[in-house]
Amino acid sequence: MQCATPLRAQQFEIGLDMPLQFISSTEHNAATAGLVLANDADAHTVTLDNVQRIDLHFPKFTDGRAFSQAFILRRRGFTGDIRAHGDVLIDQLVQMQRSGFSSVVLRDDQNIEHGKKLLSHYKSFYQGDAIHPQPHFAKEAA
């Protein structure tokens, strides 16, 4: 399977280990597709050998199955790009990053600058996440 070459993307830090990349819909459509995982696919059973990018689709912003898929893929040790596309809103960005997404293609009516401003409010989290499952209080006790 051929995976996408790195895209020119606007990238910024949100205070966590993985920077979240914003990919324009034009760049996403022009890129070679990664592994496209259907919403009803079991992320526990997909083969990850030689996969560099996995595309997870949000058919509606209310459909949260891709959050679970991203979380499972990170827990399985996948370190490549997990990209969200479809009906993706800026309101979902923090949860996407914490679930394991590394790049997003926002819905056309969403404002990237507004999303960055919203994300800047969160420097750290008390709970664990897909990348760092240990809760904050347990790290301090160690």
Could you tell me what each predicted segment is?
Residues 114-138:
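C-terminal helical cap(s) of enzyme catalytic domains, especially alpha/beta-barrels
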Residues 33-75:
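Glycine/Thr-rich beta-alpha phosphate-binding loop at enzyme active sites
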Residues 101-118:
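Glycine-rich phosphate-binding active-site loops on the catalytic face of alpha/beta enzymes
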Residues 80-89:
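Glycine-rich beta-to-alpha transition loops that act as phosphate-gripper elements at the mouths
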Residues 1-47, 122, 127:
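Intrinsic disorder/low-complexity detector
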Residues 60-62, 88-90, 110:
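Active-site-proximal loop/turn and secondary-structure-junction residues that shape catalytic pockets
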Residues 44, 90-103:
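Catalytic cores of alpha/beta
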